[in-house]
Amino acid sequence: MREKTLYARLAWTGMRKNRRLYLPCLLSCAGMVLMFYILMGLSGSPVLEHMSGGGSSAIILRLGTVVIAVFALIFLFYTHSFLIRRREREFGLYNVLGMGKGNIARILLWETVITYGLTTGTGLLLGMVLYKLAELGMVRLLQVPVTYTLTVSVSSLLAAAALFAAIHTLILLNGLRQLHGVSAVGLLRSESVGEKPPKAQWVLTAAGAVLLAGAYWLAVSIREPLAALTWFSAAVLMVIAATYLLFISGSVTLCRGLQRNKKYYYRPQHFVSVSSMAYRMKRNGAGLASVCILATMVLVMISSTTCLYVGQEDAVNARYPRDLSVKVYGDRYLLDSEKLTQVRQGVESTIFNFGGNVSNVAEYRTISISGLVDGGNIRTDSSGASVSDSTRAVQIHILPLEDYNAATGQTLPLSDGQVYVAALRAEFDSDTLSIDGGMIRHVMKREIPMLGGPSAADITPSLMVVVPDFEQFVPALQDYFMEKYRSYPTVVWHYAFDTDLPENQQGNIDGTTPNLEDALNGYLAGVSSDWGVGVSVESKAANRADFYGMYGGLFFLGIMLSIVFIFAAVAILYYKQLSEGYEDQSRFDIMQKVGMTKQDIRRSINSQLLTVFYLPLVLAGVHLCFAFPFIHKLLILFNLDNRGLLIGTTAVSFAVFAVLYAIVYKLTGNTYYRIVAEDTEKE
């Protein structure tokens, strides 16, 4: 019986004696189990499922569970490799005392079982306790009524248990693989093997600098939001690769360059710090690069999602400038003034009969096509277009001059063959406008305001073209498309207005209250049946919930992922300080023996730690500054164009993160000095 429990007791004793190493790992793993359970549970929450905007939030949260699952796999592999490296000497001693690798493997198995049981059990227990708090916070973000029913998601419990069981199994197999390839002598001498001097790697350093410069150039040079979306992933990958190259190779290359400067290097205040820094960066460059990337991810997520959440009402108003919008999709009926008057009177009668008053009416017709801008020509045939051509894609909304003047209250003049052009998220500077080389019109050089609403929802850049002869232009355009593509665009009649009705009577929000949106849909259903046209009604009040659901979900996910990434960064920094503390114990002793005082040594080490520790924060701040134009353009795709708000949220996010970072430095720095003091105080 004692033999059966021997390996479990050895595993538990080893973990308990190395609790300084294991405790952060256990806490981090339990935290990831907790976050995964909460996000998984919320994504299938019946509370979110039955509320307006909950569907958008659920999709976003499901994506978050995938991110946490992938990140947990990578991060736990990293922490476990550190633990194994620190305990190789202990395992080597077991081997010398008579244990075979099979026996050590059984110890590792028990350690994995204990780790899995502690972390998964603790994480799921805390998850069940904190789940309702997270659900209440999510509901508050969506600005919907709160329910206080306590629930436990069994499916989320099973999914979390299965996921982390698989991760710990993979970690165990990797540990056994490492153990199999090392001899007993190698295990015993693993911590005393001499370290080769780091070499300058100019090629890798130059590659990192070029990649970083290229990513920064993309960030500041791209002007169109859709192009920013296209190139964002590429820029992110370039920044990640460049950060690792510069931290691992660039920092060592810099130190080697300083060592070649004899006037600078051979001074007491520089000699020790520069030579030691080269070794530090060689050992810890990858870890510091990971911290820098995690810090950048946190800053980008928090600043952008906070900006979205705070400015969500601005986004709603940009997409829906008026309370309700009616659309009728037809052809000859909308070019016939009598038919147009008939449907207008029907809409107005429906509004009056419901008891509402209208104001701020905007009524206009449009016909829309898409194409690629080529100077002043719009190429409608996209066959053979490449990915780079997506930056030239535009959506073109054509409307009559009289409708535009009526909707904006202006009296703009136009002659035959002339047009006005307004651009949204696009640039158009040509003196002429043509469609596939035909229908050439002269562009009048005058800035005109863009009509909001449908064009604000376009992901692609938009051009609004005002023509004086809409009734003649539309048939010619439709005939051309019919001949070339066997299909043609249709005319859309827009009727948007504000009303004095309460919001729950404007749109179908709760599904039970009689509302104007349903009344208009009822009338337009008859129009659609009689005329064979398409109809739609959009309510700002009803669609506001979807906006809040999406932006609230992104904000909540940003907070949750930021917490996970911050804990991961703290764990990496903690393990870095531990490893450096153990490695510097003997160096302190040697420095004292060659004549340096403890005060000089502490000053030198403190200088190195400050440089190494704050370098990721400084570079993350630089990354954030260059990412700002990218973030701003991506937010425009979410109908939010508020540069001042984004600057504010970005500045506050960086300031708060910097304070937290400084606190972590203080705490982990104390751990480093305690480890070093354990050796020096014995002298």
Q: What is each model feature region?
A:
Residues K4-N18, V272-R280:
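A short amphipathic helical element positioned immediately N-terminal to and/or at the very start
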Residues R20-V47, S56-G92, T112-L126, A206, ...:
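Hydrophobic alpha-helical transmembrane segments of multi-pass inner-membrane transport and secretion
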Residues A315-F567:
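Basic-flanked hydrophobic alpha-helices used for secretion and membrane insertion
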